Design a protein with these regions (language model features):
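Alpha/beta-hydrolase fold catalytic core
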Residues: 105-118, 123-127, 391-442
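N-terminal glycine-rich dinucleotide-binding loop that anchors FAD/FMN and/or NAD(P) in oxidoreductases
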Residues: 171-196, 201-202, 343-357
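N-terminal cofactor/phosphate-binding cores enriched in small/glycine residues
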Residues: 141-165, 172-178, 196-206, 210-212, ...
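Extreme N-terminal leader/targeting segments of oxidoreductases
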Residues: 1-129, 268-286
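Feature captures the FAD/FMN-dependent oxidoreductase FAD-binding
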Residues: 54-104, 195-264, 400
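Glycine/threonine-rich phosphate-binding loop and adjacent beta-strand/alpha-helix elements that clamp
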Residues: 447-456
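Short beta-strand to alpha-helix junction loop
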Residues: 191-209, 221, 388-396, 423-434
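Rossmann-like dinucleotide-binding core of oxidoreductases
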Residues: 121-128, 133-149, 153-163, 168, ...
Length: 456
């Protein structure tokens, strides 16, 4: 298959609002961000692939995109290679179909210019100066890349035998990310994701690839557990006591200690009376037994947060029964691209046209982060403060309520009161959902645990 045909196949299914941004930069023609080429605002967390255009406009945009990309690949320079902050805000506003604040320009500029990440100048580091980083998970790797790029001597202490942190530990069925893969990754380290929302295995592989690509493992001490850190005021240094896999202990010294240990370890167990004497099998999802089968088991799942959203649907068809105990309900948003593979054509486009990949990621950043910001401000004159913050937030409530009711089906009458939060949408972290409402068999507040069963 020719390069032209591969590009044509990819552009035929590509995201229209993203293609428009590529068109503007490649051609310098700003008619692509004016009517009739302004996408309509997308709903929810969807990618808005069609942009809300009819087939004729979509074809015009796709044809123009193919021509512009082929010209660029043939040597035509990018007409608008470095848009100003103001131009970037204008472009993103058009692409999203809604007003993007002016202050977003600087971040957009940085995001679009960070691949690959380059350090123009090394930091002038005093002789003997060194940094200790605790943890080689997501934060630890990002810190290590930055320190290495700046020329600052450092050492990473990691208690596991490999990098990736929580994505090495969390091995429960269905473990994955509920942020889009192309957003849940470093801007300086793009990746050929196979799924729109990656599962644990691919996430671990990604962070391992970052460590390899930036040659970080030479600076990581694996199977090294930090026991304590103590600041020495007289020398303005830190003493870091560590234990190695062979049982030996050592005290290290550093000018700076950066903790990237994360918040998910060790696992937090609920304070339930009788938990320590429960005679049945029990474990925390963060310590899931490798290869454990739940076939024909009566299972109780305590908690209904993000982990439960992933675990419940994964095991519901294996177990004899599944009962969910919750402290309180959460708002959930549809998770339409969960377990959806990125088409090979789009993976090719991401690889061959960096502008497309970067603008796609930039749009995701707006959709999943700042889009709802204005709707989170409390309206002092709003007539329904008992259920929402303002009119927009109330429309969010109606949408999510309707979604829950639809998913519960004929169980809506008896479960709706139990799964519907009383606080406003986005009052807590939103949970992404594929089919968890359908998984629910009961929702009760856990108060104590007997030797054989939960009691409430």
């Amino acid at each position: 298959m020719t390069d032209k045909q591969q590009l044509a196949d990819a552009i035929a299914i590509a995201n229209i609002p993203t293609l428009l941004m590529v068109l503007v930069q490649l051609t310098g023609d700003k008619r692509w961000i004016a009517d009739p080429y302004r996408p309509k605002r997308g709903s929810g967390t969807g990618d808005n692939d069609s942009g809300g255009f009819d087939e004729a406009i979509q074809k015009e945009i796709r044809d123009a995109s193919l021509a512009a990309i082929l010209a660029w690949k043939a040597g035509e320079p990018v007409a608008l290679e470095t848009p100003s902050n103001e131009e970037l805000v204008e472009m993103l506003t058009s692409s999203m179909g809604e007003k993007v604040p002016a202050e977003y320009g600087e971040m957009t500029n940085a995001q679009l210019g960070q691949t690959p990440m380059k350090w123009e100048d090394k930091i002038d580091v005093p002789e003997g100066f060194n940094v200790i980083v605790i943890g080689a998970g997501v934060s630890g790797l990002a810190t290590a890349v930055s320190l290495q790029g700046a020329g600052v001597p450092f050492k990473v202490l990691e208690r596991r035998s490999n990098v990736a942190g929580v994505w090495q530990d969390n091995r429960y069925p269905g473990a994955g990310v509920d942020t889009p893969s192309h957003l849940y990754s470093f801007s300086f380290a793009p990746y050929d994701w196979s799924a729109y929302f990656a599962l644990r295995g691919e996430l671990a592989e990604y962070f391992e690839s970052v460590a390899d690509d930036f040659d970080l493992k030479k600076s990581i001490e694996f199977e090294t557990n930090v026991i304590s850190t103590e600041y020495q005021a007289d020398t303005q240094t830190w003493k870091v006591k560590v234990a190695h896999a062979d049982g030996s202990e050592e005290t290290l010294e550093a000018n700076v200690v950066i903790s990237c240990a994360g918040i998910f370890n060790p696992p937090a167990f609920p304070n339930i009376q009788g938990l320590d004497s429960f005679a049945g099998e029990s474990w925390h999802t963060a310590e899931w037994p490798e290869g454990k089968s739940l076939d024909n088991k009566k299972v109780i799942m305590i908690g209904n947060g993000a982990t439960a959203m992933q675990l419940g649907p994964e095991i519901q068809n294996q177990v004899e029964s599944l009962t969910i105990f919750q402290r309180g309900p959460h708002w959930v948003s549809p998770f339409e691209q969960f377990r959806v593979d990125v088409p090979e054509e789009i993976r090719y486009l991401f690889k061959e046209v960096p502008l497309y990949r970067m603008w796609y990621r930039m749009r995701l950043g707006w959709i999943y982060n700042d889009r709802v910001y204005d709707s989170l401000h409390k309206d002092p004159n709003w007539e329904h403060p008992e259920r929402s913050l303002n009119a927009t937030n109330d429309s969010h409530r109606a949408y999510f309520t309707s979604y829950m009711k639809k998913e519960l089906g004929d169980r809506a009458d008896d479960l709706m009161d139990k799964v519907l939060p009383t606080f406003p949408p986005f009052g807590k972290r939103m949970l992404m959902d594929k089919s968890s409402p359908k998984t629910a068999t009961s929702t009760k507040l856990t108060s104590s645990l007997s030797q054989r069963a939960l009691t409430c």
